[in-house]
């Protein structure tokens, strides 16, 4: 009996076996190699590229299986539209808030003031390729690109929105044929588990990819290259941190979970993004963790992939902050009307950045091209440091989409609180701590973890 109990007791995993420890160690090692042996570091770029390609290889099938089985399993097809509508509402509100926060911080800290750059002295050729690409990305062309030429082509290109489009239509079609579609659902369900197992296997190569990517970045660009524009970089990182902790922290609290606990829960994915500068690298792992923590697969399958195109909080902060930096650096005065126009244009242009290499910089070019007040040539000022801000953009986007998934699941009553308690005990500890601090600071009873500020009703058991 005792022997059986001992056999059932799981052994404690050594700290060095945890993926986040391995990735963090690899990042530090990559920085050191790139700093002390820059030529060697620059030559290690293929390691990071290879890992991103490995992960990109499985993104399309993971999305297809998750979305299709999730929608096909819905008894009420109206729920698909309801979930999608709530997700788009959330994306619109918080993407706009991210743009507004970027504007506010740029006006207060003024990171570009005092540079007195003459736009005529800048080389417009340095950003010509980005501007050309941006001009080709209109709202109509973006919507047309969602529809693939062929089903196979969408998977071959790895276009997230096209795969999502096919998955939604196929899932609805399976649900419409009723019982005759159940063999297909069972087959796809059987494929889902080994696909997520493959994801876990590929994640074991994350430390190698992070090491190569960080060694290349530090070896090629160097730390000294940050000095002249460190104010902009620091302002962007600070703004992203404040947005996550204050704005997203508030909406998390209103929906019964802690943003700090969430960050701890997805730390492996955050470190992976930090090492590779690609939020897509963490997409399969994020989808798996959101489902494990209690979100229904149907919600996860709709919200996470869609959020990667429509809920880019980090990119939105970057766009307005960088736009005002360029205006301040070139002594270009912007009235309140100009800044409102910038905000409105950015709201539209930010929705067309999915599937584009260098999406943040290209989207910035698209925004400035439509706002005559800010010189597009001024983008040459930040071209060299854009790479150093990509990590913060990607991490903020990742956290924003994780919170969006939990919030929409809570609004729909599709968040299993019992499962969350078991799978995510850290959330209970942080929430209780926050409630105690709230009582001490405010002098009245703090909301419990079941509080819902958005009228979605009590949390589901």
UniProtKB/Swiss-Prot annotation:
Transmembrane segments: 20-37, 52-74, 87-109, 151-173, 194-216, 226-248, 340-362, 366-385
Gene Ontology cellular component annotations, sorted alphabetically: plasma membrane
Pfam families assigned: SDF
Cross-referenced InterPro entries: C4_dicarb_transport, Na-dicarboxylate_symporter, Na-dicarboxylate_symporter_CS, Na:dicarbo_symporter_sf
Keywords recorded for this protein, A-Z: Cell inner membrane, Cell membrane, Membrane, Symport, Transmembrane, Transmembrane helix, Transport
Annotated localization: Cell inner membrane
Single biological process term from Gene Ontology: L-aspartate transmembrane transport
PANTHER family named in the record: AEROBIC C4-DICARBOXYLATE TRANSPORT PROTEIN, PROTON/GLUTAMATE-ASPARTATE SYMPORTER
Record-linked NCBIfam families: PRK01663.1, PRK13027.1
Free-text function comment from the UniProt entry: Responsible for the transport of dicarboxylates such as succinate, fumarate, and malate from the periplasm across the inner membrane. This transport system plays an important role in the energy supply of rhizobium-legume symbionts.
Family membership: Belongs to the dicarboxylate/amino acid:cation symporter (DAACS) (TC 2.A.23) family.
Stated name of the protein: C4-dicarboxylate transport protein
Organism: Neorhizobium galegae
